Structures are given as structure tokens and as C-alpha cells.
């Protein structure tokens, strides 16, 4: 068993402070990043045939997706809200299949969906705060469709990917 990280207490405190001081918008981005990181680790576990790590990481991502589902106001929402809820539900079902079938392709599908939704939320935040314009975001989206998505890196020992 590897020795405990002597900084783990401080890392945990840093993460807690980040969560406690984050805006609701930043918390949403953090949820997407967390789910994507869980799924990247699940893919590694699938490749290594590590049942425990696969299940643990897929379950972590599913918990985050359920939390994202809870943020949707279906009673007062529009078709976009309902569509997003169905998409999250499909992702959750795909992760169940991925876990049972040890299928990394299903995990990749969910990573791609989460990455696309995260990008949309990030751009909406940037537009709302005046960091970018809708036109700039649309140009970036068109350029991004020509390239592969860049996923947040996996960080060991509970690290934080603060932007």
C-alpha cells in the first residue's frame, strides 16, 4: 500500500474551500469535471480489468449525474430542460451497461456528452458575464467540431483542476 500523501489534509481543505466559495455556476462546472474524471479512471480500470475501481468510478459518475438531474426544474422548465433530463437519464443507463458489460465505448459516449454539455454551460456563463459574445462562442464551437475535445486531466490524490 502506497504511503499516505502528507499533503492530503491540505488538499482536502483546499477542495472544501473551493466548493464553499464557488458560485453556483462554478459548482456546475466542477460537477461536470468530476464526472469526467471518474469516467476517465473507469476507462483505465476497464482496460486493467479492475472490477472494484471500475465500479467505484462509474458509480461516482452516476451519483454526479443524478445530482445534475436534480438541478433541473421539470415543472417550470421548457423542452430544453426536459431534453436535458432525458439525456442525463440516458447517460446513467449507459453507465449501468458499461459497468455490466465492461464496455469502454459506452463510457466514451458519456464522456463526450458531458464534455459537450459542460462546454455549453461554460460558454453560457462567459456570455452572461461578458467574457465572450454569442458570436464568438458560435465560432469557437464550429472550430471545435473540427478538432477532438480536450478532456480535463486525471488528477491523483484528490487534486483540484481549478481554472
Where are these regions (language model features)?
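A broad detector of the eukaryotic-type serine/threonine protein kinase catalytic domain
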Residues: 40, 73, 93-96, 100
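N-terminal leader/targeting segments and the first structural element of proteins
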Residues: 2-79
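Hydrophobic recognition helices of helix-based DNA-binding modules
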Residues: 65-68, 95, 121
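Charged low-complexity stretches with an acidic bias
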Residues: 67-72, 86, 141-142
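Generic structural concept
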Residues: 29-36, 55-62, 85-92, 108-118
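Secondary-structure capping and boundary motifs in well-ordered enzyme cores
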Residues: 80-84
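Amphipathic, charged alpha-helical scaffolds that flank and support histidine-based chemistry
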Residues: 95-111
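Short terminal interaction segments
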Residues: 2-18, 111-163
Amino acid at each position: 500500500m502506497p504511503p499516505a500523501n502528507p499533503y492530503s489534509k491540505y488538499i482536502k481543505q483546499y477542495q472544501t474551500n473551493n466548493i464553499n466559495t464557488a458560485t453556483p455556476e462554478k459548482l456546475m462546472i466542477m460537477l461536470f469535471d468530476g464526472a469526467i474524471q471518474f469516467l476517465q479512471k473507469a476507462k483505465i480500470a476497464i482496460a486493467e480489468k479492475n472490477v472494484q475501481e471500475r465500479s467505484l468510478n462509474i458509480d461516482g459518475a452516476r451519483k454526479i449525474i443524478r445530482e445534475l438531474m436534480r438541478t433541473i426544474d421539470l415543472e417550470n422548465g421548457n423542452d430544453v430542460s426536459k431534453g436535458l433530463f432525458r439525456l442525463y437519464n440516458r447517460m446513467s443507463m449507459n453507465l449501468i451497461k458499461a459497468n455490466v458489460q465492461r464496455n469502454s465505448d459506452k463510457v466514451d459516449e458519456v464522456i463526450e456528452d458531458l464534455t459537450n454539455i459542460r462546454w455549453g454551460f461554460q460558454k453560457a456563463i462567459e456570455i452572461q458575464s461578458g467574457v465572450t459574445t454569442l458570436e464568438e462562442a458560435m465560432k469557437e464551437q464550429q472550430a471545435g467540431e473540427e478538432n477532438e475535445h480536450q478532456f480535463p486531466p486525471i488528477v491523483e490524490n484528490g487534486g483540484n483542476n481549478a481554472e
